[in-house]
Amino acid sequence: FIKSAFLNFGSIFFQILNQIRKIYLNSPIYNKKISKIDDKVIIYKPNQSILNCLIKLDKKKYNIEDFSLNSVWKDSTNLNKKSFKKLHSFFWLFTLDLKSSKKITQNIISNWIDENDKYKQYIWDLDILSKRIIAWISNSKLTYENAEANYKIKFNLIIKKQTNHLINEIRRS
């Protein structure tokens, strides 16, 4: 009986800790913590041949102008889990033709940042988050090159913020 009571207490204790953690991750305190940025500038120019061994790329390239993208982030809650992950991981950037509009691509990312700049459990899931960081940085010709200064500031901030969250979660595991 004592062993059973102890196991029940332990289970309840861990459930309470998980709930407290969820509240903390969604709090302004955590948002401020992962928003702390040092002034070091990171310059990254990805090499596609290195990425080829990590990422299965679709040989067929698409033009971003061929897609309807007006309210993609607001409509994403209606997607099934697999499509939701694909959309928010941004791995679809690898299928875009580099001649696609940089302005449209940057506008899509800017809209995503406006909708999701704070932690959201399903969107900031480690698998989705790590793929998103890889996709955004690796496709810098579309996501960053020739962008306006305000966009670059917003982009750099969210990359660093997501990276800080990723580091926190890796340290925790």
Task: Please report, for each region that a protein language model flagged, where it lies by residue.
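Generic alpha-helix detector with strongest preference for long hydrophobic helices that associate
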Residues: 1, 5, 73-77, 113-117, ...
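Short charge-dense sequence patches
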Residues: 37-45, 54-64, 79-91, 112-113, ...
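Aromatic-lined, polymer-binding surfaces characteristic
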Residues: 81-173
